[in-house]
Amino acid sequence: MYSGICIYMFLAMLSTSSSGQQATGSHNENPVATELEQSLTEHHRHVRVPSSAGQLKPIQRLDGNVDQKANIGALLAKYLQQARKGPTGRISMMGNRVQNIDPTHRINDRDYMGWMDFGRRSAEEYEYSS
């Protein structure tokens, strides 16, 4: 309990100190940081400026979206084909294992084949001969 409180306090101090450094760091005249901020704001301004080239960008985006939609459609079709074929891989191996269990096995009447629900077994108080 004490260690949990110490860890919580340490994380709280760490987060407050890092947020304090970010606030003071923006007021410092760091030439690299201010140059980076200016270049980013100029980049955003250039992107948002409407022009004839800016009008062509949505058309290119639509073409990209069409390609993405086609790819997603193809993946969905593959998935549906595999789902219709039935389970494959590890799931099918587990299914085969469940079918191969001996009918006289003592956990045959459980809901989950292959593992025991211990709470249910103890609640029902089955007596097995060992």
From Swiss-Prot:
Location of this chain's protein in the cell: Secreted
Maturation and modification: The precursor is cleaved by proteases to produce a number of active cholecystokinins.
List of residues that carry Sulfotyrosine: 112, 126, 128
Keywords: Amidation, Cleavage on pair of basic residues, Hormone, Secreted, Signal, Sulfation
Record-listed Phenylalanine amide modification sites: 118
Gene Ontology cellular-component terms listed: axon; extracellular space
Propeptide residues, chain positions: 21-60, 122-130
Molecular function via GO: neuropeptide hormone activity
Signal peptide start-end: 1-20
Tissue expression from the record: Expressed in brain, duodenum and small intestine.
Main location: secreted
InterPro entries: CCK-like, Gastrin/CCK, Gastrin/cholecystokinin_CS
GO terms (BP aspect): digestion
Similarity field: Belongs to the gastrin/cholecystokinin family.
Protein role: This peptide hormone induces gall bladder contraction and the release of pancreatic enzymes in the gut. Its function in the brain is not clear.
Additional observations: Turtle brain contains CCK-octapeptide (CCK8) and CCK7, whereas the gut contains intact CCK33, CCK40 and CCK58.
Name the record gives this protein: Cholecystokinin
High-level lineage: Eukaryota, Metazoa, Chordata, Craniata, Vertebrata
